[in-house]
Amino acid sequence: MFQGLKFEPIQLPDTAAKLRSEVRAFLASAMDDSVLRNSDFNAGSSAEFSQKIGAQGWIGMTWPSQYSGGDRSFLERYVVTEELVSAGAPVGAHWIADRQSGPLLLKFGTEEQKQFFLPGITRGETFFSIGMSEPNSGSDLASLQAKAVRT
């Protein structure tokens, strides 16, 4: 069915290649011997390292600038993510806030909540975690049975 199907290599825009070089240069200087490298994706965290990443503008980079986001593309975010993970950077401190909690606040949060939480997330100073469990499920979120009922 797929015999003979060929895909040409994707050519990334020059801006993405430049950003990749910037991230690699940052990591070469920031990932010294004091930084614990991760061998498992998202296993390690360092609040100090997250603040360094935030100072580069690489947390909340696709969010609107009115909330201290970077107004950047998802491709740029992907380039940064790929390099951080590839280098074993300790991203666990800010990962949930950047990838889950922040976007939820952008969509469902009040203006007051957005103004309060999002700038701290983008600076790498505000962290979130998610904990869910119920009987017979443990931390297997796919097996949760609880349902919300509007009252």
Name every feature range the model reports, one short phrase each.
Residues 1-94, 112-116, 120-123:
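Amphipathic, small/basic residue-rich leader segments at the start of a protein or domain
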Residues 66, 97, 134:
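Residue-level "edge-of-site" marker
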